[in-house]
Regions:
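N-terminal cap/lid segment of alpha/beta-hydrolase-fold proteins
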Residues: 1-28
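Short, surface-exposed "cap/lid" segments of acyl-processing enzymes
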Residues: 25-74
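Short alpha-helix in the alpha/beta-hydrolase fold that links the catalytic acid
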Residues: 48, 190, 204-214
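C-terminal catalytic histidine-bearing segment of alpha/beta-hydrolase fold enzymes
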Residues: 76-79, 219-258
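Alpha/beta-hydrolase active-site loop
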Residues: 81-114
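Primarily recognizes the serine-hydrolase "nucleophile elbow" in alpha/beta-hydrolase
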Residues: 105-172, 176
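Acidic catalytic loop of the alpha/beta-hydrolase fold
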Residues: 158, 199-203, 232
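Short beta-strand/loop motif that positions the catalytic acidic residue
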Residues: 187-188, 194-196, 200
């Protein structure tokens, strides 16, 4: 069952859509996984969308999923084909990191209110993981402590060869690394799982692993999982488009959810 709610956003069209996907079977206090996309990302239940596909995998296991998409000027991503930079400027020109973070927090809170009858997990990819860490590790963050946080390709410092992206909207106002490091040290959650693709060209492995190491959790409550041959976005396996990275993520997550 699919439900859509629209929240007031901070920028552009002023809308933060949240799609809630409930499993066909299962009642009671089902776990909720709230998904946050990466910078300039698009997240929906549409077939072929990374977040929609992963949500369906978790749905089949009995979890409720909520997909949050942040506010922007336009939503016609397909118009720009592979020109990611043109898309970033057209859809997000003038948007700040703080605005994007506020959208993410609003989406998390609304999804938890609407569908969080069981344990609540926040799953953030790349920038979405940064939003999840800050929201759960800063005093003025979430109104609740999530049961668990899952990161996908999230670190506190990007590779030097990728620094050109820091001139793009949102990223050009991203806070210094020490803010994320402090949030990791003060993280309020019961469990932390981080996935990292061995072919990640955005974040060095050590900057992702350190966020897990810093979290104030027992060793058995935090995991850092390297998926061999997978890219930063978890869309390819050894250079070829593949859904396998998402299947690996879901296979790790399902036992933790239940």
């Amino acid at each position: 069952m699919l439900e859509k709610i629209e929240l007031e956003g901070t920028f552009g069209d002023g809308i933060v859509p949240v799609h809630i996907m409930r499993p066909a079977k299962g009642r009671g206090n089902l776990p909720l996984v709230i998904m946050l996309h990466g910078v300039h990302g698009c997240a929906s239940p549409e077939p072929g969308n990374k977040y929609g596909e992963l949500a369906r995998m978790l749905n089949e296991a009995g979890a409720v999923c909520a997909i949050v998409e942040t506010s922007r000027i336009r939503r016609d991503r397909a118009t720009f084909c592979e020109d990611r930079e043109a898309w970033a400027h057209a859809a997000f020109r003038g948007k700040t990191f703080s605005q994007d973070h506020a959208d993410a927090v609003a989406g998390i809170e609304a999804a938890a209110r609407e569908a969080g009858s069981g344990s609540v997990w926040i799953m953030g990819f790349s920038l979405g993981g940064i939003h999840a860490m800050l929201a759960s590790g800063e005093k003025d963050g979430l109104s609740f402590a999530p049961f668990g946080i899952t990161l996908g390709g999230t670190g506190y410092r990007i590779r030097s060869e990728a620094e050109g992206a820091l001139s793009l909207p949102i990223l050009n106002t991203i806070p210094l690394s020490n803010r994320l490091i402090e949030a990791a040290k003060n993280l309020r959650t019961g469990s932390l799982v981080a996935f990292y693709g061995s072919l990640d060209s955005t974040f060095p492995e050590e900057t992702c692993r350190k966020l897990v190491d810093l979290a104030p959790l027992p060793a058995e409550k935090k995991r850092f999982i390297v998926i061999e041959g997978v890219d930063h976005a978890f869309r390819t396996m050894r250079g070829a488009p593949s859904i396998k990275p998402l299947e690996i993520i879901s296979s790790y997550m399902i036992p933790l959810l239940f």
